[in-house]
Swiss-Prot record:
Gene that encodes it: uppP
Protein name, entry field: Undecaprenyl-diphosphatase
Biological function: Catalyzes the dephosphorylation of undecaprenyl diphosphate (UPP). Confers resistance to bacitracin.
GO molecular function, one term: undecaprenyl-diphosphatase activity
Enzyme Commission number(s) from the entry: 3.6.1.27
Cellular component, GO annotation: plasma membrane
């Protein structure tokens, strides 16, 4: 029963943190430090729940883009989404083949949380002096693609934080537009990464000993929580900055570093 409870908690944690700029990977690793580690497949499945949540939130936007390619604005937006995704896929695969990734331990995660918090504050400070723009440029698309790779290499960075705030610094100063582009790019990116990782686990026969009840509970928890959090966040950022998330990251990072000493 305790294992089922921890699976539920980890699913909820994934749903809360996946699309907030606080690093879901970092929070899951911290939680697993006390609750016990889970299999790679478990972590893939709960991320899949979050992917379904964000897909459902943006279902109308996705459908509009898919059925409206006769419009230049839609074609341009889709091409930029595709560019960001392909950059992430190509560079990310090269990084994966090179086994280039920091160890998933508490100390580097703590530093990534702190640095990411400072990064958010800088981006907010710069963006508020820029005219409000919601047009995605090619430089933003390319930078977002590379930022996703950086987030994958450095646990604790946060895919949302690295992509949203780099986009804001490069001129996509309207928070909702930056967040929307980040989330839409995240759908194919996370789906592809999860599918690839799951296929690798399947080939190695590592799916035979999973507790499917725990996996299912965590999946549903991540999906429902992720949906609620994204809906809330999209409303919140219309009239608020991301600064509270920055302060939270910095505080959590400092607490973790203090705990390690």
């Amino acid at each position: 029963m305790f294992e089922l409870f921890t699976a539920l908690m980890l699913g909820i944690l994934e749903g809360i943190t996946e699309f907030l700029p606080v690093s879901s990977t970092g929070h899951l690793l911290i939680a697993e430090h006390w609750l016990g580690s889970r299999s790679d497949f478990f972590n893939i499945v709960i991320q899949a729940g979050a992917i379904l949540a964000i897909t459902f939130v943006f279902r109308k936007k996705v459908w509009s883009l898919a059925t409206g390619l006769d419009k230049y604005s839609n074609r341009d937006y889709v091409m930029k989404l595709a560019t960001a995704f392909l950059i992430t896929a190509v560079v990310g695969l090269a990084v994966r083949k090179a086994n280039w990734q920091l160890p998933e331990t508490i100390q580097p995660i703590a530093w990534a949380l702190i640095i990411g918090g400072i990064w958010i504050l800088i981006a907010e400070s710069v963006a508020k002096h820029l005219p409000e723009r919601e047009n995605v440029t090619w430089s933003v698309a390319i930078a977002v693609g590379l930022a996703q790779v950086v987030a994958g290499v450095f646990p604790g960075t946060s895919r949302s934080a690295s992509t949203i705030f780099l986009a804001m610094l490069l001129g996509l100063s309207k928070r909702s537009a930056a967040a929307e582009f980040s989330f839409l790019v995240g759908i194919p990116t996370m789906f592809s990464a999860s599918s690839y990782a799951c296929f690798e686990l399947f080939k190695r026969g590592e799916l035979l000993h999973e507790n499917w009840l725990e996996v299912s509970v965590a999946f549903v928890a991540a999906m429902l929580t992720g949906f609620a959090v994204v809906k809330w966040l999209l409303g919140y950022i219309k009239n608020h900055s991301f600064a509270p998330f920055a302060y939270y990251r910095i505080a959590l990072g400092l607490v973790l570093l203090t705990w390690l000493t």
